[in-house]
Structures are given as structure tokens and as C-alpha cells.
């Protein structure tokens, strides 16, 4: 969760790129979706 929050704070471009990488990890789709949603 901390990583997601930091990625969102980093910025839109980096946030999206990192969010895509984190999506590969065994995390719930809801968490990834929330992170991406916040980036938008």
C-alpha cells in the first residue's frame, strides 16, 4: 500500500508506469485500480 501511495505522489507519468509494474505483483486488482484512479 505504501508503494502505491508513493507512486501516486511521484507523478502521473511515473505513477502510471510504476502502477503497471506493480500490477504484475500478486496484489488485488482493487488496489491497483485505486492507485490508477488516484493518478487520474
UniProtKB/Swiss-Prot annotation:
Entry keyword Hydrolase: yes
Keywords, comma-separated and alphabetical: Carbohydrate metabolism, Cellulose degradation, Glycosidase, Hydrolase, Polysaccharide degradation
Temperature dependence of activity: Optimum temperature is 45 degrees Celsius.
Enzyme's top EC category: hydrolase
pH-activity relationship: Optimum pH is 6.0.
Enzyme Commission numbers on file: 3.2.1.21
Single biological process term from Gene Ontology: cellulose catabolic process
Keyword Hydrolase: yes
Catalyzed reaction equations: Hydrolysis of terminal, non-reducing beta-D-glucosyl residues with release of beta-D-glucose
Gene Ontology MF terms: beta-glucosidase activity
Identification of the protein by name: Beta-glucosidase 1
Organism: Passalora fulva
Amino acid at each position: 500500500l505504501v508503494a502505491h501511495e508513493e507512486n501516486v505522489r511521484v507523478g502521473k507519468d511515473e505513477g502510471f508506469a510504476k502502477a503497471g509494474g506493480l500490477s504484475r505483483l500478486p496484489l488485488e486488482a482493487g488496489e491497483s485500480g485505486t492507485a490508477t484512479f488516484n493518478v487520474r
